[in-house]
Amino acid sequence: MAKKVVGGGVKPDLRFSDESVARLINAVMLDGKKDVAAKIVYGAMDIIAGKMKDEEPLEVFRRALSNVAPLVEVRSKRVGGATYQIPMEVKASRRDALAFRWIKLYATRRGGRSMSEKLAAELMDAASEQGASVKKRDEVHRMADANKAFAHFRF
């Protein structure tokens, strides 16, 4: 019987040699255009380096990622004809995936400028615990806190 081939995962990006930057590039990518996505992300990192001269852009990115990543979320479960929102702890891989998704979403929703500028602004805001993506994380945490009474219904 043939052995099952396991996927290689995400390779680190070329400039920073960091897997999480590569995952952000993959999250920003549309229609398979990875070069365009990489140009957007690296442009955002250059903008961060220009505006925050005292800090490394990779450190700002990591701090933004940790500030946006949710620790708990609510999941729906049907119990006896009623649907409850049950707070659940978020696994590390999903935590990062949600953070990338929210950063991209709220960067896209910002007004006017180029995507690199919008992404840089969202990352800098998230690093300083401001911005829409951090508000989304806080909202998810509030929902989990409000439904703490249903925690005993865990899956």
UniProtKB/Swiss-Prot annotation:
Family: Belongs to the universal ribosomal protein uS7 family.
Protein name as annotated: Small ribosomal subunit protein uS7
Phylogenetic lineage: Bacteria, Pseudomonadati, Chlorobiota, Chlorobiia, Chlorobiales
Disulfide links within the chain: none
UniProt superkingdom: Bacteria
Oligomeric and partner information: Part of the 30S ribosomal subunit. Contacts proteins S9 and S11.
Organism annotation: Chlorobium phaeobacteroides (strain BS1)
GO-annotated biological processes: translation
NCBIfam families: rpsG_bact
GO CC term, one of those recorded: small ribosomal subunit
Keywords of this entry: Ribonucleoprotein, Ribosomal protein, RNA-binding, rRNA-binding, tRNA-binding
